[in-house]
Amino acid sequence: MMIYTDDVRKKLDAILKAFENYIDDQNYFDIVYSKKIGYVWIVVDEPGAAGAEQLDTPEAMLDNLFNDIINDVIAPRSTTHLDEAHTLTESEEAECRRKITAILEQIEGGADEYLDYLDEYIKDYQERYAGGSKS
């Protein structure tokens, strides 16, 4: 049974390699590979409360990683609890872009495609949490 096409698997592997240090530094999630269902995002911050999400596309993997980095910028886990997501301030957005771009630029041959995806992701993120008030 083939879970991914060769092309998709290469993209996922390249993303994972670029984000490897970031993922290794986090103690509350991991991305593992299963021969049966492919890459899986596992939440591991509370033993027994682990949740899992199948990452079936490069975009699904990036969505989770981008969201995690954004949450980390808005509310670092060590100091605050993220009660409610909100639109990013200019400085938060700049910090998120800086952190994510530095990682994406390590992806051979795919950086431009993923940087465009980051632009779309942040735009969607801002619209999602704008709550009707256009600033």
Residue ranges and their predicted role:
Residues 1-26:
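Negatively charged, low-complexity tracts enriched in Asp/Glu with abundant Ser/Thr
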Residues 130-135:
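Short acidic DE-rich linear segments
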Residues 28, 32-120, 124:
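Acidic, low-complexity, intrinsically disordered interaction modules
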